[in-house]
């Protein structure tokens, strides 16, 4: 019987990290280092706000872009910590996690045949997101001698006339590599020259706010 699913879905390999996660979840006294999540319960003040919202009946649809107050606070936080100003009405979209943001972002930017540059090792969802968006993932193999940081030379060598997006995790997942300001400035010049989108997977903002930011 022919598989009824789309070929691009069938061809996506399951996440190895998730396989280990499922195995460890059935074991007692095992510490999982598989998925990136805190090793403590959600703080009570956050849980209290969630409970309060439920009790106040805030359980209905919001704007497609997310709660107004949340989008405004996101802009305020980015402006305060990084000195960059965004318009909360037109430039901020709240998603259910970073993977959804990358998924819908690539779908919005890519046409069939466009290329998405993905430095690896990297988070397992980047490549499937590019494929599901109809794009072609192009892998840039990062080197240990460069501390797994993307270099300007590696980026330039990977760019073609079909290149549309560069995915740039900060810090790198799973290696933990952090791009220095000089690295980013060199890459920014190449990005500007070739007019390429950059999708920054900026997951751990609070943990690295003392360094030079993107």
What are these regions, as identified by a protein language model?
Residues 1-8:
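Generic N-terminal amphipathic, Lys/Arg-enriched alpha-helix
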Residues 8-97, 104:
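N-terminal small-domain helix-loop-helix segment of the aminotransferase-like
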Residues 23, 189-190:
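Alpha-helical scaffold elements within enzyme catalytic domains, especially in hydrolases
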Residues 58-189, 206:
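Conserved core of the PLP fold type I
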Residues 193-196:
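A short helix->loop->beta-strand "cap" motif at the edges of active sites that frequently abuts
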Residues 203-210:
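Conserved small/polar residues in nucleotide/adenosyl-binding loops
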Residues 212-214:
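N-terminal low-complexity segments that are often proline-rich with Ser/Thr-Pro
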């Amino acid at each position: 019987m022919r598989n009824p699913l789309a070929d691009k879905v069938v061809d996506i390999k399951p996440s190895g990290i998730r396989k280990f996660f499922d195995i460890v979840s059935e074991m007692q006294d095992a510490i999982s280092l598989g998925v990136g999540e805190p090793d403590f319960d959600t703080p009570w003040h956050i849980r209290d706000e969630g409970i309060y919202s439920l009790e106040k009946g805030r359980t209905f649809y919001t704007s497609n872009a997310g709660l107004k107050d949340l989008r405004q606070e996101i802009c305020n936080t980015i402006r305060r910590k990084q000195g960059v100003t965004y318009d909360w009405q037109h430039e901020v979209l709240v998603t259910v996690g970073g993977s959804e943001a990358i998924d819908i972002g690539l779908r919005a930017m890519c046409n069939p045949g466009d290329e998405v540059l993905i430095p690896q090792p990297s988070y397992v969802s980047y490549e499937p997101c590019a494929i599901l968006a109809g794009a072609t993932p192009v892998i840039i193999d990062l080197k240990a001698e460069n501390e797994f940081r993307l270099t300007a030379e590696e980026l330039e060598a990977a760019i073609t006339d079909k290149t549309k997006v560069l995915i740039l995790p900060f810090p790198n997942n799973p290696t933990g590599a952090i791009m220095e300001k000089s690295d980013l400035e060199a890459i920014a010049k190449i990005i500007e020259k070739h007019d390429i989108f950059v999708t920054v997977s900026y997951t751990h903002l609070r943990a690295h706010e003392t360094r030079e930011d993107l």
